[in-house]
């Protein structure tokens, strides 16, 4: 959705770039975006924010110096900082340690909760 694209742009500019410091991100490795399915692929569950076009899963990054980081292998200080910075820009942020379904990627979506952002 347009809201998700705007949130992604805001996160890149205000969260990802500052978190990476001097490392210039030239590519964000997207694992999933729009896909019509239920949450966590569970039969009979609620439709996922991916199915509404409001979610992006980030699997890693490529840098200008040719190095690459995956969330699964490089959930380091900079990536944790970028993950934390997404909270509030997105309605939901999930990643390693959140729930078992997001150990190898960062999940961001623009769901709107009355209680505020859900960040884990």
Which sequence ranges carry the predicted segments?
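Active-site acidic/histidine clusters and adjacent loop/turn architecture
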Residues: 1-28
């Amino acid at each position: 959705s347009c809201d998700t694209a705007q949130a992604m742009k805001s996160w890149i500019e205000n969260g990802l770039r500052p978190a990476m410091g001097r490392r210039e991100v030239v590519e964000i490795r997207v694992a999933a975006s729009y896909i019509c399915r239920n949450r966590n692929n569970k039969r009979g569950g609620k439709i996922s924010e991916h199915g509404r076009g409001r979610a992006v899963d980030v699997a890693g990054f490529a840098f200008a110096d040719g190095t690459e980081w995956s969330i699964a292998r490089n959930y380091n200080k900079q990536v944790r900082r970028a993950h934390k910075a997404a909270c509030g820009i997105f309605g939901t942020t999930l990643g390693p340690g959140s729930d078992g379904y997001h150990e190898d990627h960062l999940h961001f979506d623009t769901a709107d909760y009355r209680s505020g952002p859900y960040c884990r």
